[in-house]
């Protein structure tokens, strides 16, 4: 009951902000102050946010004065403009879009064994590995663990991959599966994945600050991340491009990508439908603990879905690299999106507050519990 009362208070506060904004044509300081209050309360140092609903577009980069100098905040010198963040698993959705474009052109068969395209040397169980397909990877039904070892470690590229579940038996989130599919795409295209991404996504959409690899501009634009205790953990450079987690971007760039997803840019209607259609099984995040929120969540081709009583199908993904956390929500029925990036371990604590403010949903999204509750 207490949580519902808190949610109701936030929802009505969002309505007040909305009414004030409409009547004042619009006063963006109302949103800015509300977002600033949210990140101060949740101990998030920095947030970038982009949204576009019903023609009302929001674009913010807001610093927390408890982490950055107030004088520099006022002068605009506290953080680089635009700040570049680790996108974490939002990396996967950009890659999924690339795969779906290749599928649309007949360059990859979603149901063909990936061993037709690349080797399976790292897999302990070769028979199971030979059954893996792109569709299984994108639906997170490979049976693989998230990672065999830390993917930024020196040992990871040659580490042995052991199956966690039987192939195609259940939902099981796996970065290792995406890395396997990355190798297949690189073999098909004869190029490194960042070069493929530049051709397919970054250049066509004007995402000039986005890359799977470290770029010289990141020396000044990339921001430091902060752990749960508010300690600076640095920028966190990764040793190699990995579609599971190494994308760096800014919210404005990623918003261009989200608009392209909504519009189906570069995809036939059929491919867009396949992209956004869930596999039919619920995405039960913890096999030993079936939660109520799991009943609303499934996985399409590299993108999460929520069946929402207010908005219908909602498309989403979260990013979690520890000291960098991010989120996007696409609502096709409203032709709108919200995305935000934070440099904080607390970056997902604000999901309900931010969605109530920006989307003005009457009830919390199941997404919040799916991400935050064990």
Please give the residue ranges for each predicted region:
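Bacterial Sec-dependent N-terminal signal peptides
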Residues: 1-31
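Catalytic loop of the DD-peptidase/beta-lactamase superfamily, centered on the K-T-G motif
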Residues: 24-64, 198-199, 203, 235-374
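Short active-site loop at a secondary-structure junction
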Residues: 45, 71-136, 163-176, 242-245, ...
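Active-site helix/loop module of the DD-peptidase/beta-lactamase fold
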Residues: 86-90, 102-144, 187-230, 266
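Catalytic-site signature segments of enzymes, centered on catalytic residues
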Residues: 77-84, 144-221, 239-255, 259
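Short, conserved catalytic-motif segment at the N-terminal edge
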Residues: 32-85, 107, 154-161
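Stable alpha-helical elements in mature extracytoplasmic
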Residues: 31-35, 91, 110-114, 130-134, ...
């Amino acid at each position: 009951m207490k949580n519902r009362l808190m949610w109701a208070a936030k929802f009505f506060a969002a309505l007040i902000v909305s009414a004030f904004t409409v009547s004042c044509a619009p006063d963006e300081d109302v949103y800015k102050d509300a977002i600033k209050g949210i990140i101060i309360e949740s101990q998030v140092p920095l947030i970038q946010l982009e949204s576009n609903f019903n023609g009302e577009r929001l674009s913010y980069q807001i610093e927390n004065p408890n982490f950055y100098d107030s004088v520099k905040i006022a002068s605009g010198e506290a953080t680089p403009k635009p700040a570049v963040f680790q996108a974490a698993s939002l990396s996967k959705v950009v890659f999924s879009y690339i795969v779906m474009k290749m599928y649309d052109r007949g360059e990859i068969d979603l149901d063909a064994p990936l061993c037709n395209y690349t080797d399976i040397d790292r897999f302990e169980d070769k028979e199971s590995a030979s059954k893996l397909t792109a569709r299984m990877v994108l639906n997170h039904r490979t049976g693989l663990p998230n990672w065999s070892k830390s993917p930024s470690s020196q040992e990871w590229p040659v580490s042995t991959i052991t199956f966690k579940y039987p192939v195609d038996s259940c939902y099981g989130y796996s970065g290792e599966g995406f890395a396997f599919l990355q190798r297949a795409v690189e073999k098909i295209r004869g190029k490194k994945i960042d070069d493929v991404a530049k051709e397919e996504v970054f250049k066509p959409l004007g995402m000039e600050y986005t890359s799977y690899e470290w770029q010289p501009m990141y020396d000044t634009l990339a921001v430091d991340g902060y752990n749960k205790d508010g300690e600076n953990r640095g920028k966190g450079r990764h040793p190699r491009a990995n579609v599971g987690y190494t994308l760096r971007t800014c919210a404005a760039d990623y918003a261009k990508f989200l608009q392209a997803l909504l519009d189906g840019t570069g995809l036939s209607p059929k491919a867009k439908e396949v992209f956004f259609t869930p596999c039919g099984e619920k995405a039960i995040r913890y096999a030993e603990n079936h939660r109520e929120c799991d009943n609303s969540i499934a996985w399409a081709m590299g993108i999460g879905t929520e069946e929402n009583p207010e908005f219908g199908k909602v498309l989403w993904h979260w990013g979690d690299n520890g000291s960098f956390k991010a989120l996007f929500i696409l609502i096709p029925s409203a032709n709108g999106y919200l995305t935000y990036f934070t440099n904080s371990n607390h970056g997902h604590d604000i999901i309900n507050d931010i969605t109530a403010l920006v989307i003005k949903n009457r009830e919390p999204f199941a997404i919040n519990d799916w991400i935050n509750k064990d």
